[in-house]
């Protein structure tokens, strides 16, 4: 079934009419020219990514230039397997990113991360709370007052205590072993007019990971639905890879673009209401694109200022300070960076940010 689907998908992309009209802001889709522009930006900002050509001229697509048929980064580490507990939490408590339009529960993208465990952990941390008055005096516990406070043992007393050593029970398998690496490929889907991600895993530099084992690194709700095993269309010989189907990419990207623009508008409004240069400076230094991604550490997505350099936002998203009403939070050349941030929810064990290290 996957072979038939892969063949149909390849021919559908090659035979679909090529769009030359930009609808980036209104649909979340991009043209082949915009894909090349976004790819050039990704390669420039993050040299671990590079352009690559098809394995033979017959495998090239006509709407992309030779030598820029797809993007690739190699040796991305994957330190953990996604067990059934992780997948179960993803199915129960995770948030679905919607495009704000009417539709069924499938019209969106699942934001993963073990929401139930995080919520329970948060409840555990907040259940035993003490208050502190203005003088710095610590009050009694809000809950559990009748429980005696445990004595904190001296670590030096535990150095030779065999019972204090935590050992992993025999026969149990850790979700952090063995370490795998992945080659990631970003292609352009001409039918859906969005990027598409392919993954090829390795147990060692010389030992490819069998395709069915790649599914161990995919969130359970996506296996055989959003993620399937298909031949990579740009290689001869039928190289099987895991691929994230692009049918929802445009709507999710549109949602993220809208959120980023809304966050930029909020920041502009705050700057207008600032009462002092110091307050304006503090607002400008705040993290941009609120609600787009939960973490952006390690990324440097904004171009450096041409004059004057510096600024605390150098490792964050660039938000220009001049107050232009038509200014957007994310340019089309930054498209693939945002794409990689949301696609990471499918494979949270793979360190996508590793490919963006500066």
UniProtKB/Swiss-Prot annotation:
UniProt entry tagged with the keyword Cytoplasm: yes
GO molecular function: Atg8-family ligase activity
Described purpose of this protein according to its UniProt entry: E2 conjugating enzyme required for the cytoplasm to vacuole transport (Cvt) and autophagy. Required for selective autophagic degradation of the nucleus (nucleophagy) as well as for mitophagy which contributes to regulate mitochondrial quantity and quality by eliminating the mitochondria to a basal level to fulfill cellular energy requirements and preventing excess ROS production. Responsible for the E2-like covalent binding of phosphatidylethanolamine to the C-terminal Gly of atg8.
Swiss-Prot/TrEMBL keywords: Autophagy, Cytoplasm, Protein transport, Transport, Ubl conjugation pathway
Stated name of the protein: Autophagy-related protein 3
Region spans: Disordered: 112-161
Organism: Aspergillus clavatus (strain ATCC 1007 / CBS 513.65 / DSM 816 / NCTC 3887 / NRRL 1 / QM 1276 / 107)
InterPro entries noted in UniProt: Atg3/Atg10 (IPR007135)
GO CC entries: cytosol; mitochondrion; phagophore; phagophore assembly site
């Amino acid at each position: 079934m996957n072979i038939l689907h892969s063949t149909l998908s390849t021919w559908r992309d090659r035979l679909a009419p090529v769009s030359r009209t930009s609808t980036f802001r209104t649909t979340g889709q991009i043209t082949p020219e915009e894909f090349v522009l976004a790819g050039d930006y990704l390669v420039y900002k993050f040299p671990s990514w590079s352009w690559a050509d098809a394995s033979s001229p017959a495998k090239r697509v006509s709407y992309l230039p030779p030598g820029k048929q797809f993007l690739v980064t190699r040796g991305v580490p994957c330190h953990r397997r996604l067990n059934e507990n992780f997948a179960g939490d993803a199915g129960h408590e995770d948030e679905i990113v919607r495009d704000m339009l009417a539709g069924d529960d499938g019209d969106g993208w699942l934001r993963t991360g073990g929401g139930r465990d995080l919520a329970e952990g948060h409840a555990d941390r907040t259940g035993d709370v003490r208050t502190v008055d203005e003088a710095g005096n610590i009050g009694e516990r809000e809950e559990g007052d009748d429980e005696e406070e445990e004595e904190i043992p001296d670590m030096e007393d535990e150095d030779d205590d065999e019972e204090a050593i935590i050992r992993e029970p025999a026969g149990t398998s850790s979700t952090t072993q063995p370490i795998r690496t992945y080659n990631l490929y970003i292609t352009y889907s001409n039918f859906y007019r969005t990027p598409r991600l392919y993954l090829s895993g390795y147990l060692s530099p010389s030992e490819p990971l069998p395709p069915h084992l790649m599914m161990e690194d995919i969130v359970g709700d996506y296996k055989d639905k959003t993620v399937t095993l298909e031949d990579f269309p740009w290689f001869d010989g039928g190289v099987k890879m895991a691929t994230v189907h692009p049918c929802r990419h445009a709507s999710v990207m549109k949602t993220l673009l809208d959120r980023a623009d809304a966050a930029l508008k909020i920041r502009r409004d705050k700057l207008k209401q600032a009462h002092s240069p110091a307050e304006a400076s503090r607002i400008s230094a705040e993290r941009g694109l609120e609600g787009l991604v939960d973490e952006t550490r390690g990324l440097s997505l904004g171009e450096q200022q041409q004059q004057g350099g510096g600024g605390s936002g150098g490792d964050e998203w660039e938000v220009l300070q001049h107050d232009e009403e038509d200014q957007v939070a994310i340019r089309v050349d930054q498209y693939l960076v945002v794409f990689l941030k949301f696609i990471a929810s499918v494979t949270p064990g793979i360190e996508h940010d590793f490919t963006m290290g500066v």
